[in-house]
Amino acid sequence: MERSLYDRLGGTDAITAVVRAVVDRQLKDDRINRKFARTNRDRLIKEFVDQICQATGGPCKYTGRNMTEAHHNMGVTNGEFQAFVEDVVAVLNDFKVGATEQDELLNILAPLRGEIVEVDSDQTGTSLPSEFTPAPALSAARRD
């Protein structure tokens, strides 16, 4: 029996380490960091870990908003989504994740483009529109 992508990525601890590194990289990336201006970092990490964990066959359950709702009014461009993907790939390379696993993970993330991108433009570094309403911070009970 073939091991799940979750297992091949190293489980929850490894996924968490990668997600933390991705988020930290994105917060420093001028191509996309403005989109995170009002995002709660802890919530973003928790929700992203749960989403990746569940999507790769792990035991986690993603309970956050769907991607259309979560990114509604963010004005994410095609260029910014591409910058996000490039940051993910750079971190996966830093963590020496194999090409097969990277391809499988990117194939999971790729369909989300249509739910996240609202602006058909290659522009990056756009400001977060004032209409965007971020999700609230996680309660202490949900962080664990």
Task: Give, region by region, the residue ranges found by the protein language model.
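Core of compact, soluble alpha-helical bundle domains
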Residues: M1-D144
